[in-house]
Amino acid sequence: MVLTDGQGFRLRWSVSAIPDDFNLVSIQTVSPQTSAVYDMRQQQQLAFESGIDQDYTFEITIGHYQTFTLNLAPGWNLVSITGIPKTPEPAVIAADHPNLVLPFYSWDSTEYSYQPVTELVVGQGYWLLSTGPAITQLEIPLIQVNSYQRYISPGWSLVGGLTQPIDFTDTASVSDQPIGDPSVRSILRNSLYNWQPNLYAYDRSSRLGPGKGYWVLSLNDCQLTVTADAVNMLSPAIALPST
């Protein structure tokens, strides 16, 4: 734990003593809660601004990246990832699959248009086109996370799932804190739709599934928080005591 008293600070580290067999060495801020996970082999420090009287608690995880597999049907697929990818660039992730057509696309709800994707982020939904005649298995090494937060603007947005099915109507797992007027409703819980590539049709859903992307409608600016049951998450990683 770091006690700041409103002062900024910089957290530095060295992982030279950790055996190379552990390809996952990550750090995450658990208080205040955030979904951001940082690869400690890729960077050696984090900086935090001053002016906020906030105590920080960090969790360090040592283990191995898990492989998450997307099963992609021929045609357009609406997908998401369940964690922080080792390599976020779609061009690198899809390099061994010539039948996957770049770019991937996300939806910009403020511009009302699709945008090409340069990095995959947990919590976002993406359109991906496969020209293969059968199911393509796209394997993505990543750090599993059990929650994410993201801003949702009014209108339709593309969101994603986590490592296990989540009841979208359960306010303990899915919260949509309004930004601005707290009396205004935000996300409509019955507006969750996923895409069925085999049927070429949308299907209304009440659950967020792993690897799937979904359309959802919000009436207001809000902060969406989605949380999975951490007890049921299976991971070969070892969480060290919080510091």
Locate predicted features:
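N-terminal exported-region signature
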Residues: 1-25, 30-44, 48-243
